[in-house]
A protein has these predicted regions:
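Auxiliary tRNA-acceptor-end handling modules of aminoacyl-tRNA synthetases
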Residues: 1-19, 69, 179-182
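Positively charged, Gly/Ser-enriched RNA/tRNA-binding surfaces
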Residues: 19-37, 48-49, 82-94, 102-157, ...
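Short, solvent-exposed loop/edge-beta patches enriched in aromatic
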Residues: 33-42, 71-73, 94-97
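Polyanion/phosphate-binding surface patch
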Residues: 42, 46-75
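Short secondary-structure boundary/capping segments
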Residues: 58-59, 176-178
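Acidic, His- and aromatic-enriched active-site or binding-groove loops in soluble protein domains
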Residues: 63-72, 178-200, 291-293
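Glycine-rich, mobile lid/loop segments that gate access to catalytic sites or pores
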Residues: 161-172
Length: 452
């Protein structure tokens, strides 16, 4: 028989057990955060009709998707979680209660060129609030609070949630007589951090047809310095000249005004007029979140307000606001920067029960007592030397061992050994469960991310 060399395709990630535990812990924190704000979990098929996924049209998306025929059916793998959400809300409109708040953590697929930190299969973690006909601005103010809570519970403190409003930008372009080019201009200024102001100015002139004087004015406007309060004051100087601009400024003031009540610290929030988000469907507040010490990573959480999520599937107007975290990429870059905590307990069990008796009745009963107390317990029954059993626990990173020999079994007692300190005590199974549970509660309080 010819054996096949096991390999993983380029652009696809497989993790060893300890790293997988870290990833799962991150997902748990995201789920907990999203649930605290009243979001319900949603799962949609990985494979959809290509007609449904590409209802908006082809372009770059069609070039990147994984698409195939099964019989006469044209199928594709989902490339994000937004289009499946639009389909889901349109298909189940009559059975949903609005505003509909959902979160979804799932794999998506894009046939991009594989490169460092970029994947073809990756997890996204999305939240969206969908309204029926209208959606109150307070939902746009709540989004930064959710980002703040999520990132702080992951263990991050040095991050900034950067916020802007597309109506402010559209209104400003209208004042310059550039409304027809607004979409192209936004996609261009969205590149500011990557290529710098001079190159953006050149692109505005060369590709968007903007006159040099107006290109300079755009760069000056979006590069306004100062605090969030300074920028709001700067924007007030334009009030009264354009209705769209004024509406966007009102929305920006509302979002910024509610953040202290939502518990968002001032140092973790900034109004940033350079944030445009290149996607055309954003119509109001837009968000990007960056790590203060690692600006080269770029945005790790982004999104915004849109006015008609499902226009390609229904005539119902379904406005919404949402954000997305590229979880696989975030996990990868955190690992690259050494920010994933090595103190996080990644072992599959809290305790390894090591029977040293022929009769396993008491060791099994003791294991049951431990599990009923919430202690993750593995019983080692392989016929190996004691030294090999402890070596197994050490290699797996299991912090405690419960040793049960004939003497312990005769007394209905167990020996609990802390495999870090080497200390060993004789006690009842119930006492052992309480001791290990209390110790593990402390050890499990370590965050996934540890900032330097």
């Amino acid at each position: 028989m010819e054996r096949v060399t096991p390999r993983t395709l380029s652009g696809f990630m497989e993790l060893l057990p300890a790293k997988q535990v870290q990833m799962e812990r991150m997902m748990e924190i995201l789920r907990d955060s999203y649930s605290l704000y009243g979001f319900t979990p949603l799962d949609t098929p990985v494979i959809e009709s290509a007609q449904v996924l590409l209802a908006k049209g082809g372009g770059e998306t069609e070039k990147q998707i994984y698409r195939f025929m099964k019989g006469d059916t044209d199928l594709a793998l989902r490339f994000d979680l937004t289009v499946p959400l639009a389909k889901y809300v349109a298909a189940n409109y009559g059975q949903l209660t609005f505003p509909f708040k959902r979160y979804q953590i799932g794999k998506v697929y894009r046939g991009e060129r594989s490169q460092r930190g970029r994947f073809r299969e990756f997890y996204q973690a999305d939240i969206d609030v969908i309204g029926d006909g209208k959606l109150d601005i307070i939902n746009e103010a709540e989004i930064p609070a959710i980002i703040y809570r999520t990132f702080t519970h992951l263990g991050l403190s040095k991050f900034v949630i950067r916020v802007n409003n597309r109506k402010v930008l559209n209104g400003f372009f209208e004042l310059l007589g550039l409304s027809e080019s607004a979409g192209d201009i936004m996609r261009t200024i969205d590149k500011l951090e990557k290529i710098g102001g001079e190159k953006v100015k050149q692109l505005l002139m060369d590709e968007c047809g903007v006159e040099e004087e107006k290109a300079d004015e755009i760069i000056r406007f979006i590069s306004c310095p100062g605090t969030s309060a300074d920028k709001l004051s700067f924007l007030e100087t334009y009030r009264g000249r354009c209705e769209t601009f004024d509406l966007g400024l009102d929305e920006l003031n509302t979002v910024a005004g509610y953040l202290p009540a939502f518990g968002v610290k001032e140092e973790n929030f900034a109004i940033d007029l350079t944030i445009a988000r290149g996607l055309d469907y954003y119509t109001g507040t837009v968000y990007e979140t960056t790590l203060t010490d690692y600006p080269e990573i770029g945005s790790v959480c982004s999104g915004g307000r849109y006015d008609n999520l499902a226009e390609y599937y229904t005539d119902k107007k379904l406005p919404g606001v949402g954000i997305s975290i590229g979880l696989t990429r975030l996990f990868y870059v955190l690992g690259e920067q050494g920010l994933l905590s090595d103190e996080l307990v990644t072992a599959p069990a809290d305790v390894l029960v090591i029977p040293m008796t022929e009769d396993l009745t008491f060791p099994i009963a003791a294991s049951t007592t431990l599990r009923e107390a919430g202690v993750r317990t593995q019983i080692y029954t392989e016929k190996k030397k004691v030294k090999q059993k402890f070596a197994y626990a050490d290699k797996m990173g299991i912090p405690f061992a419960v040793i049960i020999g004939d003497d312990e079994a005769a007394q209905n007692m167990v020996s609990v050994k802390d495999l870090t300190s080497g200390q060993q005590e004789l006690m009842s199974p119930a006492a052992a469960a309480a001791k290990i549970k209390a110790e593990m509660d402390v050890r499990n309080s370590v965050t996934v991310i540890r900032e330097k």
